[in-house]
Amino acid sequence: MASTTSTLSLSWSNSFHSFAGAISEPQKSPENCRVMLPIVAQKKVKKIRKIILKEDIPDLGKKGQLLDVRAGFLRNFLLPLGKAEVVTPLLLKEMKMEDERIEAEKKRVKEEAQQLARMFETVGAFKVKRKGGKGKQIFGSVTAQDLVDIIKAQLQRDVDKKVVFLPDIRETGEYIAELKLHPDVTAQVRVTVFAN
């Protein structure tokens, strides 16, 4: 039994040494006389997948964003919960069309805001009547809602009171109100307050 084990270990060590020798020594192929070296990979290749998020995920991205994630994260978390889709050429085409549509809508909204701002600036001043007190004081104050009501009455335009920024008006006189119609478009209107 001992002789069988020793011959097995000898044959195994011989085959290992011959394999190790083949790796360390370059081999020449007879037809081209080129040196051939075997390539041995050190690490596994990371498997990364391209995805599009279906909803906002904290610390990862926003809805509609194109991301690279590891295959395991996609397979074990994102796909079972329905939070992402694997990118396909058709999906990329649809995403591009959706982006173009959104950009066109943003451009249209901005143009409408610019047109509305020009209209406000050509109007001149909006007049507000209040019951007068001593000197220049008025009873109460002029609020953003008052200005919104006046704009609706005079121009037949609905404006949200959240976009109207007025100084604190408690006296008669002329004031400048700012209307933030769009992140890039701001209109300034004059508000004249007088007592009856």
Swiss-Prot record:
Its main location: plastid. Residues 1-41 form a transit peptide. It comes from the Eukaryota. It holds the Pfam family Ribosomal_L9_C. GO terms for molecular function: rRNA binding; structural constituent of ribosome. Keywords: Chloroplast, Plastid, Ribonucleoprotein, Ribosomal protein, RNA-binding, rRNA-binding, Transit peptide. GO terms for cellular component: chloroplast; mitochondrion; ribonucleoprotein complex; ribosome. GO terms for biological process: translation. It is found in: Plastid, Chloroplast. Belongs to the bacterial ribosomal protein bL9 family. NCBIfam families: L9. PANTHER family: 50S RIBOSOMAL PROTEIN L9. Component of the chloroplast large ribosomal subunit (LSU). Mature 70S chloroplast ribosomes of higher plants consist of a small (30S) and a large (50S) subunit. The 30S small subunit contains 1 molecule of ribosomal RNA (16S rRNA) and 24 different proteins. The 50S large subunit contains 3 rRNA molecules (23S, 5S and 4.5S rRNA) and 33 different proteins. Component of the chloroplast ribosome (chloro-ribosome), a dedicated translation machinery responsible for the synthesis of chloroplast genome-encoded proteins, including proteins of the transcription and translation machinery and components of the photosynthetic apparatus. This is Large ribosomal subunit protein bL9c. It comes from Spinacia oleracea.
